[in-house]
């Protein structure tokens, strides 16, 4: 069965005709030219399995957001090189599941890559966008350092929104640092850190080499480097080869967290394709730490969490809405 693709943006179908559609896995639907003002109407009329959006126009982001509120559908966004990583990341905030950089003169290899990505995203459930704000933080009594001085989080497709929901439940006075590995396009982690800083009460930074972690701070693995944690609480960036196709690798972060902090570590694996992170989560559990996997119903893609569950790596399998509270409970009990 071929998946139905709606293209939104001036001249996008003409560009894509160079190699996107083979008639077997993907077929175009809708008018040859769909502008952003007409995006929602086109989605409602033609029922695409996935939408391909060009980000070069100023009204692209509101159009994505409007579609995701009114009639959710998986969205892949293409951005030209003139956009910064932070600007392109805003497409993911609006609801796009992924963003790819479009070269000035894309050739067949690029469209083959886009085609494969569209086939994957067409099989992903879209989640309706709900605008939320961080809840007011209640005053908390000072407590001694917990025996869980580290929370390590791994996520892939759908991860930024999921992580934001978890972190909104955590106050600024959270007595542990949080190390976070997210599969995301190169150059977008700065935008992710900036967005999460505005969405949560926590301090959110791109991780830097040899930095001593601080409680109440989230450290994001930068694109192109593995993030590791050391027993004394320092971060290490490793530019070595990708592990099973990923750099940063969720497995490498979680494994180092388990090795370094053992029973003082809480590991969390959220929505994402594939199996990266499952082995690392099991390492945390085997060394006495506590572990959580997101449940299927609340995941955009139940791939990484499913693999962790099948391995016996998760103490608890929880809906996204309960993970933040679980982290607070486990830290507070200590």
Swiss-Prot record:
PROSITE patterns per UniProt: CHEB (PS50122)
**CDD domains found in the cross-reference section:** CheB_Rec
Asked if the record carries the keyword Hydrolase, the reply is: yes
User: GO annotations under biological process?
Assistant: chemotaxis
Residue intervals of the CheB-type methylesterase domain: 147-334
- Per the Swiss-Prot or TrEMBL record, the active site comprises 156, 183, 276
Q: What is the protein's name according to its record?
A: Protein-glutamate methylesterase FrzG
Species, as recorded: Myxococcus xanthus
Q: Which gene encodes it?
A: frzG
């Amino acid at each position: 069965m071929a998946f139905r693709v709606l293209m939104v943006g001036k001249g996008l179908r003409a560009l894509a005709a160079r190699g996107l559609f083979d008639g077997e896995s993907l077929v175009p639907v809708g008018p040859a030219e769909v502008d952003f003002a007409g995006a929602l109407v086109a989605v409602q009329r033609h029922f695409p399995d996935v939408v391909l959006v060009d980000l070069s126009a100023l009204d692209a982001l509101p159009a994505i957001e409007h579609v995701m509120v009114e009639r959710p559908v998986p969205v892949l966004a293409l951005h030209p090189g003139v956009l910064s990583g932070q600007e392109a990341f805003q497409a993911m905030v609006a609801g796009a599941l992924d963003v790819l950089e479009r070269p000035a003169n894309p050739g067949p290899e690029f469209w083959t890559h886009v085609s494969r990505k569209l086939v994957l995203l067409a099989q992903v459930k879209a989640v309706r966008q709900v605008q939320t704000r961080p809840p007011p933080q209640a005053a908390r009594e000072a407590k001694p350092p917990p025996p869980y001085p580290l929370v390590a989080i791994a996520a892939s497709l759908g991860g930024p929104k999921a992580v934001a929901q978890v972190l909104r439940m955590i106050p600024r006075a959270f007595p542990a640092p949080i190390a976070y590995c997210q599969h995301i396009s190169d150059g977008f982690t700065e935008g992710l850190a900036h967005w999460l800083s505005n969405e949560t009460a926590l301090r959110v930074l791109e991780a830097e080499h040899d930095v001593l972690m601080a409680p109440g701070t989230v450290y994001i693995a930068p694109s192109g480097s593995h993030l590791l944690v050391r027993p004394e609480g320092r971060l290490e960036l490793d530019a070595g080869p990708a592990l099973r196709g990923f750099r940063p690798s969720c497995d490498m972060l979680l494994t180092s967290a388990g090795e370094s902090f053992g029973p003082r570590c809480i590991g969390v694996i959220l929505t994402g394709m594939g199996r990266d992170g499952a082995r690392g989560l099991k390492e945390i559990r085997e060394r006495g730490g506590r572990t959580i996997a997101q449940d299927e119903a609340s995941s955009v893609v139940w791939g990484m969490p499913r693999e962790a569950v099948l391995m016996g790596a998760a103490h608890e399998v929880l809906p996204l809405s309960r993970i933040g509270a679980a982290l607070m409970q486990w830290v507070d009990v200590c």
